[in-house]
Amino acid sequence: MTRIILSILRQAAEPFTTRDIALLLLVERRLDRNDQRLLRLMTKRVGVALRGQREKGAVWSEHGPGQHMLWRLAHRKIV
């Protein structure tokens, strides 16, 4: 799942909410994106994966609209 999430963020032109990423993940995995229960579950799982990647320094988060977090890749300087 983390691989797909990072791939989604690599292709993003702007930061995405956790829910946006979960929706794109459902499409990538060819799952029913209209299933609200599945979307809520995947949003939680994506959030857990993103927090783990934030702790590793791979992604950054910032407060977005309402209680939503916006996520983007952390750009590392290669020396």
Regions found by a protein language model. Give the residues of each.
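Positively charged, polyanion-binding regions of nucleic-acid-associated proteins
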Residues: 1-17, 45, 51-54
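Residue-level detector of family-conserved "landmark" positions at structurally sensitive sites
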Residues: 19, 35, 63-64
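Short, positively charged loop/turn segments that connect secondary-structure elements
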Residues: 26-48
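Short acidic/glycine-enriched loop/turn segments that link adjacent beta-strands
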Residues: 65-69
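Short capping segments at the starts of secondary-structure elements
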Residues: 10-19, 24, 28-31, 71-76
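A short, conserved structural fragment
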Residues: 51-64
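Intrinsically disordered, low-complexity serine/threonine- and proline-rich regulatory segments
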Residues: 1, 76-79
